[in-house]
């Protein structure tokens, strides 16, 4: 379902009025009240989101590209087709019964590093949410250790949780989309950028330690 179809004035008014059926409908699309947020506040946030998504669509149509934040340019012709996004929505629906199909996705033209796969972007002021993935996924499903469906499902899970300011368990739920049991188990451990360093540093130092031990053994036997 497109954002314009879901985020209508009538639907948002029903949310403001506390309609249980409207709340259930939005919940299934990954839109739900934040902790401590009442129905009126939730409706106001949805209204800001609808405006932001509408402006994004209009700016792309008129200008061909927009820059939602410094260093990241989104192009109209780089929008991820619904058929490809649908791969990930199947996974989020199966895992969480949530289908955030209103979240726009784009293939990134910029290079963010050899190991970069994708990320979700959120603007707290306008409530705009979107995600970008490596352009290589336009033509292939796999890139290094990344799987296109898994990566998009991961970022869409983040997008659906944009109203929850909870860092501790966020990666746990996002990594539940992983096909690998190892990534599902360890993925939630990487909360900050320093966590991955704590995990990788001992692995990177292992060859050095082995070499030092080997040299000492050689001197002792000599």
Which residue stretches match the model-derived regions?
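C-terminal or late-domain output modules
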Residues: 134-138, 149, 192-196
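Active-site recognition of the HExxH zinc-binding catalytic motif
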Residues: 146-163
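N-terminal pre-first-transmembrane soluble regions of secretory-pathway and organelle membrane proteins
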Residues: 1-87
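Pan-zinc metallopeptidase signature
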Residues: 217-222
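Alpha-helical transmembrane segments
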Residues: 205-214
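Short, flexible helix-coil linker/hinge segments at the edges of structured domains or between repeats
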Residues: 120-124, 132, 150-151, 178, ...
